[in-house]
A protein has these predicted regions:
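Short secondary-structure boundary/capping segments
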Residues: 5-7, 38-39, 47-49, 61-64, ...
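Amphipathic alpha-helical segments
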Residues: 23-36
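Conserved short beta-strand elements that form part of the metal-binding/catalytic scaffold
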Residues: 36-69, 115-120
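Residue-level marker for the onset of beta-strands and adjacent loop->beta junctions
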Residues: 13, 45, 69, 102-104
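N-terminal beta-strand motif that seeds the catalytic metal site of vicinal oxygen chelate
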Residues: 1-26, 69-71
Length: 121
C-alpha cells in the first residue's frame, strides 16, 4: 500500500490490559469507573467491559510482574468526568490541572497499575 492510498474501512483498536485477576478488574471498572461488564470467558482468563463511546476494553490474565498499559482518553467535559470518577472512588493519582503542554488532564490508576490520562484541549 502506497503512502497516498487509503486503508479500507477498519474499526478502532481495542486495548487489552494485563491484569492479575480478570473478574476483580471487571468489578473495579464497573464500580470505580462506571463501566458495564461485557463478558467473562469460562476459566476467567479473558473478559471485557465497555463505557459509552469509548468502546470495549479487554482484560487478559497475566502473571506479575507485567508492564502496565497507558491510555489517553479524550473527555468532552473534563470537569464533569473528573467529578464523576472522583465520586465513584476512582484512584486519581494526578488531580485535574492544566499541564505545561497545554492540556487539562488528570490521571487514574487501576489496581494493576494501568494508567488512564483523561484530557481535554
Amino acid at each position: 500500500m502506497g503512502a497516498k492510498e487509503k486503508m479500507s474501512s477498519i474499526g478502532r483498536p481495542v486495548p487489552e490490559l494485563p491484569v492479575a485477576d480478570v473478574e476483580r478488574a471487571q468489578q473495579h471498572y464497573r464500580d470505580a469507573l462506571g463501566f458495564e461488564i461485557g463478558w467473562l470467558y469460562p476459566g476467567k482468563e479473558i473478559g471485557a467491559v465497555s463505557h459509552d463511546d469509548m468502546g470495549p476494553i479487554f482484560f487478559r490474565k497475566r502473571k506479575p510482574p507485567f508492564e502496565p498499559a497507558v491510555h489517553w482518553v479524550f473527555a468532552e467535559d473534563i470537569d464533569a468526568s473528573y467529578q464523576e470518577l472522583k465520586s465513584l472512588g476512582a484512584n486519581i493519582v494526578d488531580p485535574l490541572e492544566r499541564k505545561p503542554w497545554g492540556l487539562r488532564q488528570f490521571t487514574v490508576e487501576d489496581p494493576d497499575g494501568n494508567l488512564f490520562y483523561f484530557h481535554h484541549d
